[in-house]
Amino acid sequence: MLSTCNSQLDGILFSKPSKIVVYGIAGSGKTNFLLNILKCSKISNENIVYISTEDPVFINRAIELGLESSNFYFASALSQEHLISLILDSMQFNVITIIVDSINHLYRVESEKDYASKLFVDILVLLDSLNKKGIAIITSAQVKLEENIIAGYEYLNIWADKIIEIKVLPNKTRTIRIIKPAISHEIPFVITSKGIEWLYKT
C-alpha cells in the first residue's frame, strides 16, 4: 500500500492508481517527498521502480533513509530515449508504482532539439498506458524559476490526474498544496535526517 505517512494526504493521492505530478522550485523537497513515499509504503510481493533523470545525489539520500528493500529498483536516465527504455524494462518486474524524478528535466535539456517535444509526449503516453493497467505513476517536475511555472505545463496539466505544489516558507517549513483537484487546505512539513516530518500528522 502506497503511503506518505500522512493519512489525509494518502486519501487524496492514493485512493486509486493515479498519475501524480509534484512540483516546486529547486531545493523545495520534491526528491525527499518521493523518497518518503518509498519509506512509508508497505509492499510485499510487488515492486516500486524509481528512475532519476538528474544527478545521482538521490542515492546517498536513499541510503541515509534506509531504502535498501529488495522491492525497490533504482535507475538513472541519461536522455528521454533512455527514460523510455528504462520504463519499458521495468515491466519485467511486478511493478505497482513507477516514480520519475523529474519527468521534465531531460525535456528541458533537449528542448532545442526538434524531436524533444515528441519524445516528451511519447513518455507521457507510455506512462498513461501503464497507469490504465493499474500502475501508479508519481513524478516530480521542475519549474521555470522566474515564473514558478512547470516546464511542459501545457502537456502535464492535461496528463496528470493530480498535481501538488511544494512551497518553502521563510522559516524553512514546507507546505503541500493540492492544485489538481483544487483543495484549499495546505499540509506543512519539515525535512529531517530521518525523512519528512509532518507538523500536523493525521
Over which residues does each language-model region extend?
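Conserved P-loop
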Residues: 15-89
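Phosphate-binding/switch region of NTP-binding enzymes
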Residues: 130, 135-202
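P-loop NTPase motor core
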Residues: 88-159
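Pre-Walker A adenine-sensing motif
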Residues: 3-15
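Short, glycine/charged-enriched secondary-structure capping and boundary segments
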Residues: 36, 63-67, 88, 112-114, ...
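Short acidic active-site motifs
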Residues: 8, 82-86, 152
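A conditional alpha-helix N-cap/helix-loop micro-motif detector
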Residues: 2, 31, 80, 119-120
